[in-house]
Amino acid sequence: MILDFIPLKEHLPYLNYNIRNLNNGGTLDFSYLVDTFEKMERTTSRLMLTDHLVSLLKKTPPSAIDKVVYLIQGKLYPDYEGIELGLAEKMVLRALSQSIAGLDIGSLSKAYRETGDLGDAASKIISAKKNKNQVSLFPSEKMTVERVYLTLDKISRTTGPGSQELKIRLVSSLLNDSTAREARFVLKLIMGKLRLGIADYTVMDALAIAFTDSKSNRSILENAYNVTSDLGNIAKILAANGIESVKSLQITLYKPIRPMLAERVGTAGEALERMTGIAAAEYKLDGERIQIHKGKERIELFSRRLEKITHHFPDIVEAIAKSLKSTEEIILEGEVVAVDLQTLELLPFQELMHRRRKHGIQEAMEEYPVVLNVFDVLYINRNAKTSLTYIKRRDLIEKIIVQQHSKNKEYDTNNNKIRLVPQTIVKNPEQISEFMTSAIQSGCEGLMIKQLNSIYRAGAREYAWIKLKREYQSELADTLDLVIVGALYGRGRRVGKYGALLLAAYDSASDIFRSTCKVGTGFTDKDLEDFYVTLEKHRIEHKHARVDTRMEMDVWFEPKIVIEVIASEVTLSPSHTAAMASIRQNYGLALRFPKFTGKVRDDKNPEDATDVRELISMYKQQMQ
């Protein structure tokens, strides 16, 4: 133990709180987790990340496995719990000043400016004090993963009068007993700055190898994850009871299901061909996809990214409570869309984002009214409905959602905030074209074409669902959602901002983001300023382990932010790695004349971005 700190006496009760609550089923030294963190930071290989994680998981006792899985991803719970680790910088600085004897805030601030990371800065200061042999006035407690987790959990849940002081003391209690290396990662966790490049699929690969000796069992873990969205709980069940217990995990109310996704095609004819000549066509709305969980006592709303967004839409919650009184438990999927009350016209996605505010919810409700358009049902009264065919699920929601509005006022939010997504059965391209015209005139993006006998496969992207947008002359028939992975500094008017962003498509087969274009057009001055600020918190020192590109960038980022672009065509490129060698040896696929549409896809995870398979399909369509 390094005695670099002089703890304050009043911190001891909080230390005791953590120790009393430890699980007696075995502990894991936090230093071992730190060793693994450091190895992961140094690697740029996804395979090496997996190897490091396998070694860690094998040495982790079952009682701590869920905590380790959460912590390596920089969280305490699954995303749907909505519990964040981030703590204000000023509070962390106060905790440091109470924990480190003789701390010079000026020196710390200077180191912080140099490193850009408070954890790195504090580690330098603490290391420098080692040689002074400062001795603790009180016996210190052991730093275990369980203790760190429980303390962070208490910090995240502490609210009300005096909460700031309590949080500072809890942070100090950890820093008092940390080595310089441990303190570095404690602070990274507290401030939400842990960037190890560990994706969900990497964790599942490692769990399968560590506990079943076969990566092929990842598919079982993935199925469980798709219906529960909780990797920590899956890991705990796997470690304690084995793979057979994981197979028994089912859909549960208030645990969001990973959404089923659609493939894309360029023409109505191809869509029908995929559907063997008959299909359902639904309006594709320009809103936010949400999942509604209604139980006896409460209603929760989850975003496409599985984040809890209930507080953003209290009007939708109220409408659901009124409309579905007779149904005790239900999980629905739908699209929330902003509406102009004067014209009853649908408004674009950007207008809906005004509802994503923490304060002034009532004002936002009045200024940006919304309606919910339901298109699927996944669960009713403790029974999953995902194995039913599409047409049977549609019949169910038609019985559940009673539409009381007239045809002339389909979006009259004063009378009815819930409606069914308009749908029709189509048997030829002409019927699709006619319904497409109706959708576009109603303010929609296009159509969703769905196979009548398809089941709902959580987390899957397949041709059972196809998205079809209106065709544009001299441009691709659809926009693309791509992930920002790097940037070049701007020149001239763009000095002090980024001049171009490197964008990547997602390769689901290998869980890698592969570059497909640099985009520098379509941005307003405000866009450039906003991106510079937003991307700063995702900036990393080297190319991310899950990014594949031949391009050299001035700056690299974690693959986190998804933006929408349009382009003239997909072309072969020796410089970009998306779909490398799929069409021609040593050539990937790139976008020609890409342009930012102005839309940041906050509703999408990086893994929801355009897949390289879609790029290949779009390229082949051009050649026909």
Over which residues does each language-model region extend?
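N-terminal nucleic-acid-engaging modules of covalent nucleotidyltransferase systems
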Residues: I2-N428, L501-A504, S508-K518, V547-M551, ...
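Detector for conserved single-position "signature" residues within domains
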Residues: T437-C444
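Beta-rich nucleic-acid/ligand-interaction surfaces
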Residues: K427-E434, S454-A458, W465, I540-E558
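Short beta-turn/strand-loop junction motif enriched in small, turn-promoting residues
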Residues: G192, H359, S454, E471, ...
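C-terminal structured "cap/appendage" subdomains that terminate the fold
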Residues: L535-R592
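Flexible, glycine/threonine-enriched loop-and-boundary segments that flank and lead into catalytic domains
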Residues: M260-A281, L285, P429-F435, Q451-R491
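A short-motif feature that recognizes glycine-rich, charge-decorated loops
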Residues: T310-H311, I512-D548, F557
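Short glycine/proline-enriched turns and hinge-like loops at secondary-structure junctions
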Residues: H293-G295, A458-E462, D478, R494-G499, ...
